[in-house]
Amino acid sequence: MSVLKEYRTVSEVVGPLMIVDQVAGVHYNELVDITLHNGERRKGQVLEVQGDKAMVQLFEGSTGINLAKTKVRFTGHPLELAVSEDMVGRIFDGMGQPIDGGPELIPEKYLDIDGQAINPVARDYPDEFIQTGISAIDHLNTLVRGQKLPVFSGSGLPHNELAAQIARQATVLNSDDNFAVVFAAMGITFEEAEFFMNDLRETGAIDRSVLFINLANDPAIERIATPRIALTTAEYLAYEKGMHVLVIMTDMTNYCEALREVSAARREVPGRRGYPGYLYTNLSTLYERAGRLIGKKGSVTQIPILTMPEDDITHPIPDLTGYITEGQIILSQELYKNGFRPPINVLPSLSRLKDKGSGEGKTRQDHAATMNQLFAAYAQGKQAKELAVVLGESALSETDKLYVAFTNRFEEEYINQGFYTNRSIEESLDLGWELLSILPRTELKRIKDDMLDRYLPKADTTMTKVFVAND
């Protein structure tokens, strides 16, 4: 068996990859122990086996490896994570090793980080609401337990602050079930790592969170393993401990860049923009680990965050992510420049499962109707503002001016809630009604009369201010 053999037949090292000759009984994904000439120990994983040659990806980099004196031992099992319920409240590096100075964890079991394929027949349909405390998500792009809902950001936008806000505020309503957040940060700077750790500690959110941090100067191979380690932890807490787990993964662009780096080192034929041709398949092995299982109490919900290179939504990373996931939350450069936080652009954003997690018994009976009316009114108000820029304010009708007033207040009060305001779904719904009261009742055509009679406040026309863009 290969597990009993030690090889000194390293023939080549290229970037994060090492070639070992004259091997036997070695398997794909097998964990590798590497001992350098100075006694230093490193880990690797078998990427490919051809004949008697094995290609090994190195987790700690290839610096200092002496081809003739390096010893390689194949362990006979894949990379596994030691899991325990005591992981909640702890901080780990990208490979699952504690870095918070806490007590040593006693593992309850060891799990393969690649997980197990979920039989589609065993999946349960996501239909239960998760409250993030952010109106633009909870009310307009509802997040449902078991869903995968990515955030598409851009360079310089505050996606880290949004990720921390969701980690702090996310909760399950009307349930005594345990809720946990698994946070995986990939390729981030020391400053960003400090921000996440301090924010979760200072707000007390660390007590229900598991934090995995892969820094920008850590090896690319580790970056590829980090989200799998985080998802393995989430699956353990969800399906074996009955917890509802929200997994936040940032930044998936850094993950994909690591895939491209390893692919280039393997001299593979590149696909679109140099990314490997299997990028879609690889991303699906992460995103499809979200969900609920019939007969299991817990659930795994994902919010992957990615920065779109050059703000290009047709770039392979957001493009392929959109095919796999169930919607997207898009951050806007324009809203950010105008001082709105979080700068969520609600019109192109979408949660494909929002109808499944809203309504009476889940949120409130007026949820869907007000959501549709707010979308329609905001879109019409944006059109009126654009018309005023071209033709002037005098070209607007009185109704158009009311739509402009609605749009400005919608952005200033509804979207611009700040990163430290936690709104309940009832507060978001009530604020939506308050803003809709700016418009004439005859314009609220997407809401039934009985609902208007019950929820629509009386508009104070003397207080309505009309703002028209004069750019």
From Swiss-Prot:
Family matches, as SUPFAM superfamilies: C-terminal domain of alpha and beta subunits of F1 ATP synthase (SSF47917), P-loop containing nucleoside triphosphate hydrolases (SSF52540)
Keyword Ion transport: yes
InterPro entries per UniProt: ATP-synt_VA_C, ATPase_a/bsu_AS, ATPase_F1/V1/A1_a/bsu_N, ATPase_F1/V1/A1_a/bsu_nucl-bd, P-loop_NTPase, V-ATPase_su_B/beta
Pfam families: ATP-synt_ab, ATP-synt_ab_N, ATP-synt_VA_C
Cell division found in the keyword field: no
Keywords from the named record: ATP synthesis, Hydrogen ion transport, Ion transport, Transport
GO molecular function: ATP binding; proton-transporting ATP synthase activity, rotational mechanism
GO biological process, one term: proton motive force-driven plasma membrane ATP synthesis
Protein family per UniProt: Belongs to the ATPase alpha/beta chains family.
Role played: Produces ATP from ADP in the presence of a proton gradient across the membrane. The V-type beta chain is a regulatory subunit.
Name listed for the protein in its UniProt record: V-type ATP synthase beta chain
Organism: Streptococcus pyogenes serotype M1
